[in-house]
């Protein structure tokens, strides 16, 4: 059973977060291992496995990028497979330039302002890619969606680096 079906949701990228959380809580209550404490060993083990599956499913569906990755996995695309190389050299060059730019920001006297501008630009890039991804998933163009998800993963890592630098600048 796929994660969407487990939560009684249609298989599509856009998910009602409130409904997802509500169904998660219902499933947690229904299959919590403590409810099976006096049950036979096989039922207790099944409850533990179900609880783990429910938690994994919730985490996968809750986060937009993980949800897209999961949807692609349902169609045979493993975006976590590092053997698939990024062939978009323009995107890779852009990533190198962005990382170099981020590396130089901390050395600047106006690092806070420059980092804010950089973070805003990055958010626009992420928003644009997410829009492309949503369109590709909705239209079931799985190969294009997988490519976009891989690009979003690069941008997501860059976003994490921005947040780390923001914390470092606050600690100064």
From Swiss-Prot:
SMART domains: DnaJ. PROSITE patterns: DNAJ_2 (PS50076). Keywords: Chaperone. Gene3D superfamilies: DnaJ domain, HscB, C-terminal domain. One of its GO terms (cellular component) is iron-sulfur cluster transfer complex. One of its GO terms (molecular function) is ATPase activator activity. Residues 2-74 form the J domain. Pfam families: HSCB_C. One of its GO terms (biological process) is protein complex oligomerization. The keyword Chaperone applies. Interacts with HscA and stimulates its ATPase activity. Interacts with IscU. Belongs to the HscB family. Co-chaperone involved in the maturation of iron-sulfur cluster-containing proteins. Seems to help targeting proteins to be folded toward HscA. This is Co-chaperone protein HscB. It comes from Pectobacterium atrosepticum (strain SCRI 1043 / ATCC BAA-672). The lineage of its organism: Bacteria, Pseudomonadati, Pseudomonadota, Gammaproteobacteria, Enterobacterales.
């Amino acid at each position: 059973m796929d994660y969407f079906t487990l939560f009684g949701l249609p298989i599509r990228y856009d998910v009602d977060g409130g409904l997802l959380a509500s169904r998660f809580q219902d499933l947690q209550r229904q299959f919590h291992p403590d409810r099976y404490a006096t049950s036979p060993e096989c039922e207790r083990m099944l409850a533990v496995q179900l609880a783990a599956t429910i938690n994994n499913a919730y985490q996968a569906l809750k986060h937009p990028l993980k949800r897209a990755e999961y949807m692609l996995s349902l169609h045979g695309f493993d975006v976590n497979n590092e053997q698939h190389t990024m062939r978009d050299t323009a995107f890779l060059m852009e990533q190198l330039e962005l990382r170099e730019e981020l590396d130089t920001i901390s050395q600047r006297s106006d690092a806070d302002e420059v980092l804010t501008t950089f973070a805003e630009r990055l958010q626009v890039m992420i928003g644009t890619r997410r829009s492309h991804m949503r369109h590709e998933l909705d239209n079931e163009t799985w190969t294009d969606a997988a490519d976009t998800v891989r690009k979003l993963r690069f941008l997501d890592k860059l976003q994490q680096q921005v947040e780390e630098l923001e914390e470092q600048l606050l600690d100064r």
